[in-house]
UniProtKB/Swiss-Prot annotation:
Designated name of the protein: Peptide deformylase
Gene it is expressed from: def
Residues of the active site: 142
InterPro entries: Peptide_deformylase, Peptide_deformylase_sf
Xref: HAMAP family: Pep_deformylase
Cofactor: Fe(2+)
Family from the record: Belongs to the polypeptide deformylase family.
Length: 175
């Protein structure tokens, strides 16, 4: 397994919508394994394929150490391919989020408290998952990446521009 390079804002790839995967193959699984290793290396809760430069609708998530819900031992890591949010609660919960593609920034984001998704798993099997609390937030954050949306897109344009200027300076090692 390889550690993949992280794409950071303002890279334009992060603003593009990712493409559906036709089938989960051995090659797809190897890529997901590399994504997982990269996510652990970055100490992240989740990772979308676009964050490593691949515009495919693939997510990996592992929050087992922070999930308040008791789950089966083999529940994590989650490999989520072609996710579709098929239901979401009307109740919104606001929380502070960070993102490895938006380094050194934290943003308050309001998201539905619970969601239901359908997706393909690691073995190309159709699955449905109801998630709430922290897992719902992580899935929605990563799902936004697949749609070309970053957490800073929830900010006002003025605040977003300030963050983007900071990120450009950081990228150019001016900070």
């Amino acid at each position: 397994m390889s550690i993949l390079p992280i794409v950071t804002a303002p890279d334009e790839r992060l603003k593009q919508k990712s493409h559906r995967v036709l089938e989960v193959t051995d090659q797809t699984r190897k890529f997901m394994d590399d994504m997982l290793k990269t996510m652990y290396h970055e100490d992240a809760a989740g990772l979308a394929a676009v964050q490593v430069g691949i515009l495919k609708r693939i997510l990996v998530i592992d929050i087992k150490d922070h999930d308040p819900v008791e789950r089966p031992k083999d529940f994590y890591p989650l490999f989520i391919v072609n996710p579709d949010i098929i239901d979401k609660s009307e109740e919104l919960v606001t929380a502070n989020e960070g993102c490895i593609s938006v380094p050194r920034q934290r943003v308050e984001v309001a998201r539905p408290e619970s969601i239901k998704i359908k997706y393909l798993d690691y073995h190309n099997k159709q699955q449905e998952l109801e998630a709430n609390d922290w897992l719902a937030r992580v899935i929605q954050h990563e799902y936004d990446h697949l749609e070309g949306k970053l957490m800073i897109d929830y900010l006002s344009s003025l605040k977003r521009d300030v963050v983007l200027r900071k990120l450009k300076k950081l990228k150019n090692n001016i900070v």
